[in-house]
Amino acid sequence: MKFVLAGLAAALLVIGNAEAASLDMAAAEAMMKKDGCAACHAVDKKIIGPSYQEVAAKYKGDKEAPAKLAKKVKEGGSGVWGQIPMPPNATTSDADVKALVDWILTLKK
């Protein structure tokens, strides 16, 4: 029984890590350029908007973070990181938004 539970736990870890790693750095950077994110955001420094590392740190442990951030990417908004509003990205596919948000949330400072 212990071996079954250990195997199940290992499988869940692999599945979870594979999902989080579904977007690598090169793919994320290409997506950021294609969708215009790189004009305001960088991985490790503030440009106009916060760095993705800052976003990941702010939302660490928040189970609602993926949904909150996906909504913010799609609809835009202001007041969370300063006065300059983030424009909406309504034409970016839901799959691309999810992949990018999931990747951002894996980053560490």
Question: Where on the chain are the PLM-derived regions?
Answer:
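Sec/Tat signal peptide C-region and signal peptidase I cleavage site
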Residues: I15-A21
